[in-house]
């Protein structure tokens, strides 16, 4: 069952409108806002440089010129709150649209790109989010009211993208070897996270929201970033490969590797992370030389992803990852399997 929760956005929108006029919230009102937006608060309070207290401050001070938070995330959220107030009529129109959406229709299309027997039971929390257009967290989704709802199809594509992440995460959580690797606080953890991010975002982009990699189908700022990625594609793939090489060194520093991963997996402009683009290009290449079923199997067998991609890349003339690095990634899983058996 897939449902939509719009209460958080409704309550926060009313709060932002009142606050922008200089009306300080009563304690009871603040608690109502926080309770209705608990999912949003829990997601962001785990990010570096963001706390529950700083989120509350941003909600209350977003419209004050002197409020300049150091965190780029808080800065983006404040900008989003200001935009929501300015575009209040569009926000209300988006809410009205969302009241008429039938979420279960979306599920069938997403299941086609996930392993058999993937349960897709989730909640779509509508947010007012100037940093993330959409995100998946603990089996549920956030989707920003700030996005342009051009059509039902466009909205369904955005939700499908995040819902695919929910299904993907279901299998990650049931893979004890991968779970162990993802909690090592080591270079190996970063290597596995990087490969997993390329696969997860690549599948969601290519299969569920393909318009996100077409310049003519996206807003101007997004199209500009997409164009720059296309022009620098080989350099970006080289950065991805260098991250693997760095993370796979025996003496790899976890913090340094993590920072390099964030540079590829997060876009602080809130537009399009590099890893999303590279992953989509990888799945596109694989789709030309491998059956869809084989690509979907990588969700449960992550170690097969890079070898399978390299096979297709060699045939199509795309970027090929260093075979020795690809083999090292495979060996990580084999070594962990022996250790855990």
Regions found by a protein language model. Give the residues of each.
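Post-HExxH zinc-binding segment in Zn-dependent metallohydrolases
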Residues: 1-36, 171-245, 315-320
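Auxiliary, metal-adjacent structural segments of Zn-dependent hydrolase domains
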Residues: 84-137, 152
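Surface-exposed patches in mature extracellular/periplasmic domains of secreted proteins
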Residues: 110, 117-126, 217-222, 294-300
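A short mid-domain helix/strand-loop element embedded in enzyme catalytic domains
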Residues: 125-143, 166-183
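Catalytic glutamate of the conserved HExxH
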Residues: 158, 162-170, 202
């Amino acid at each position: 069952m897939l449902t939509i929760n719009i209460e958080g956005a409704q309550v926060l929108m009313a709060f932002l409108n009142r606050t922008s006029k200089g009306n300080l919230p009563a304690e009871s009102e603040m608690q109502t806002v926080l309770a209705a937006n608990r999912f949003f608060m829990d997601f962001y309070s785990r990010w570096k440089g963001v706390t529950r207290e700083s989120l509350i401050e941003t909600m209350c001070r977003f419209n004050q010129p002197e409020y300049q938070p150091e965190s780029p995330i808080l800065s983006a959220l404040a900008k989003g709150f200001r935009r929501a107030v300015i575009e209040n009529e569009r926000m209300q129109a988006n809410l009205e649209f969302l009241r008429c959406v039938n979420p279960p229709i979306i599920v069938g299309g997403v299941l086609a790109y996930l392993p058999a027997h993937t349960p897709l039971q989730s909640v779509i929390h509508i947010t007012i989010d100037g940093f993330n257009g959409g995100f998946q967290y603990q089996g549920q989704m956030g989707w920003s009211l700030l996005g342009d709802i051009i059509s039902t199809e466009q909205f369904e594509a955005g939700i499908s993208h995040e819902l695919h992440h929910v299904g993907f995460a279901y299998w990650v959580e049931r893979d004890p070897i991968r779970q162990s690797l993802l909690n090592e606080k080591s270079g190996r953890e970063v290597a596995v996270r990087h490969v997993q991010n390329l696969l997860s975002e690549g599948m969601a982009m290519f299969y569920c929201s393909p318009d996100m990699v077409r310049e003519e189908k996206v807003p101007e700022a997004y199209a500009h970033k997409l164009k720059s990625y296309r022009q620098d594609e080989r350099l970006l793939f080289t950065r991805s490969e260098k991250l693997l090489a760095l993370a796979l060194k025996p003496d790899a520093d976890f913090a340094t590797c993590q920072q390099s991963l964030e540079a590829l997996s997060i876009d602080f402009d809130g537009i399009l992370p590099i890893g999303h683009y590279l992953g989509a290009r990888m799945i596109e290449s694989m789709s030309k030389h491998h059956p869809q079923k084989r690509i979907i199997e990588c969700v449960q067998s992550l170690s097969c992803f890079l070898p399978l991609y390299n096979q297709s890349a060699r045939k199509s003339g795309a970027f090929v990852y260093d075979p020795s690095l690809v083999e090292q990634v495979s060996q990580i899983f084999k070594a962990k399997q022996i250790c855990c058996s």
